[in-house]
Amino acid sequence: MDGSHFPMKSTTGEPVSSGKKGKRRKVIKSCAFCRKRKLKCSQARPMCQQCVIRKLPQCVYTEEFNYPLSNTELFEQVPNVALVQKIENLQTLLKENDNNNAKPVYCRSSENPLRSLRTSVLGDNGSRYVFGPTSWKTLSLFEQNKFQTEFQNLWKVLKPLPECTKSQLNENDVVADLPSFPQMESCIKSFFAGPLFGILHIFNQDDILSLLDRLFIRDTTDKNLVILLDLQGNAKDKYNLGIVLQILCLGYYNQDIPSSVSHFLHTLSAASLSSSSSNFVEKLQFFLLSYISVMINCTDGVWDATQGVDLINELCQGCISLGLNDIDKWYLNESEETKQNLRCIWFWALFLDVSTSYDIGNPPSISDDLLDLSIFTAQNFQSPSIDFRRVKLMHDFLDVSRFTTREIHKREMNEKLTTFSLRLIEFIQSNFSPIEHYTNSVYYSDIDPFDILILSRSLSIVASIYNIEMIIAQQSRIIDKNRMVQFLLISISVCVNTMVFHFKEPINDQENVLTEGLKLSIILINPLLIRIVSQVYSLAFNRLIFREKAFLFLIDLDTGKKIQFIKYEEENFDELLTGFDVRTDKFLSFSGTIIRFYEIIDSIFAVNERNKRLLKAVSNFYQLTSTLAFERVSRVLFDKASQARIETEKIWLKKGINMEHFSDLMIEDFINDVWKTFKEISKDLWSIDKKKFYKQYHFDL
């Protein structure tokens, strides 16, 4: 029976028209999706079976009306499900392909279990070596059992011995050149009371003094006379003797080191570099002192770090071999004082590693995987003789300098060079007093020498980065160029102030003795001083021969007269030495930069009695002498080159050549003319007497 014949009430509540028969509306039970697709709807709430199967996000019921809904109305809040699913499938596939093709990346959060797979082996003579996870000794000795122990004991008995060869060290040859016993004792005490040990702390005084009675045999009738050395009791003693001799080189012999002592130290270093059976802490102490002695007493040209790089590489390798990168594990039962000394050795190895490698141009020898900077904590450095402020300063410097050096040597650089310099500038601003305290000698008495040590290395890196950027880009932004000028002037000011402040006038007839203050100055500023001097003059010469895109004219193109270098006060170069703000609207003038540099470095050449004594003392240090002589020679050549440039400009101007619009060919011709003029006016320099040459620049060799 057809239900359409039964009368229905209006669902709208409106009265039915009396003159016209109303249309009936059915109650809609199916969802909108099933009704539109003509599917059998289960009418389940809130989701029917058809919508569940298709994973639709919603199921729409329209009970109050039955007119059709468009796709837009039905799914206006719903994404295209099929398209979303396809996108998800493609993303999953892409991720799988990336994982298959990408280089393995090890997450820091998951600790590498191989790092704990190490073993410490103690040799027959007391030498220690920590072997890593790939060593056969680690794999065979990591979990020892009775049979392995028995094998080790039997091997000690049956192990073939090498043929004995005569020692090449000839230790007793040095006896004839030793000072008296009281002089050695006094020298060692002076070393521990002096400024060098004040920043080292790698051993203690009592241990070194005890070596004198044990190693140096005195005459029975004259206790002041050393007649023999006793090195038979302990394999470490050759390094103990080396430590004592290095202290004597620093405080007694100075640069007048006897050939027997020099030969012994050289032979000991060479033997250590080629030996794996002499791994002692004393060896590391010997290498540290040897490096310091090389820096102070080196006569092998101006410092470029090659003079001591082998010592530092061996020092770093020895630290790792002895387990100094994990002192709390391998030296658990040692006294706290011994642990502090070991931490300081590791402390200096890391510092000299990054400093030397940067000066050489290589990445650090010690990799990040072997380094845990969290050891630089107050808990680990509780000794009253160690200032934790210094420890934190070293920690922060190692963090930023190692990052910079590592990034520079990566195959692909992720950041711009200037970002490295900005990080270092931020480090300097955060960890040091206002820069004016280092560039103004008035404040120097309150400055910790350790601060100068770290600051000078930081300045060296910043100045070199800006220099590298200039070389690569050929044209720098105003702010980068001006900041480079600023750091060059700050750096030379720090170097000069350090030398002047730490110079203590010699007493009585000790003019030829190396003063402790200047020894310290060399340690503090040696890499920085030669870097800044060479960088300033290198940039100056490049400026003279159009290596930069911007031209420089030394004469007025309208009048043909020489342009006088402007006074630096007009650009306020002094303000550059008080902070890190630089002008960004205009380049600092080339002439003003050169004049200010001259004024700063010439302050130690000014004619007065104190400077005369200072330069006399400086002449006893070959490293300082050679660096300052390097500056004097560079200046003479630069002055001659400037003169040649001016004369060439005048000649070209007279010829009517438009010098404001140079082509590449014209630039090449111009440089050739400058060079010819320079060769002509500088030929007298090759025949001048050396002493006369330096004397005219107030530098009496």
Curated annotation (Swiss-Prot):
Q: Which GO terms describe its biological process?
A: cellular response to stress; DNA-templated transcription; positive regulation of transcription by RNA polymerase II
Molecular function as annotated in GO: DNA-binding transcription factor activity, RNA polymerase II-specific; RNA polymerase II cis-regulatory region sequence-specific DNA binding; zinc ion binding
- Residue ranges of DNA binding: 31-59
Q: Where in the cell is it found?
A: Cytoplasm; Nucleus
Q: Which cysteines are joined by disulfide bonds?
A: none
Question: Per its UniProt record, what InterPro entries does this chain match?
Answer: Transcription_factor_dom_fun, Yeast_MDR_Regulatory, Zn2-C6_fun-type_DNA-bd_sf, Zn2Cys6_DnaBD
Record SUPFAM superfamilies: Zn2/Cys6 DNA-binding domain
Q: What keywords sit in the KW lines?
A: Activator, Cytoplasm, DNA-binding, Metal-binding, Nucleus, Transcription, Transcription regulation, Zinc
Endoplasmic reticulum listed as a keyword: no
Annotated segments matching region Disordered:
1-22
Q: Pull one GO CC term from this UniProt entry.
A: nucleus
Indicate yes or no for the key word Transcription. yes
Which protein are we looking at?
Answer: Transcription factor PDR8
Signal peptide location in the record? none
Outline what the protein does: Up-regulates the transcription of the genes for ATP-binding cassette (ABC) transporters YOR1 and PDR15, for major facilitator superfamily transporter AZR1, for pleiotropic drug resistance SNG1, for alpha-glucosidase YJL216C and for YLL056C.
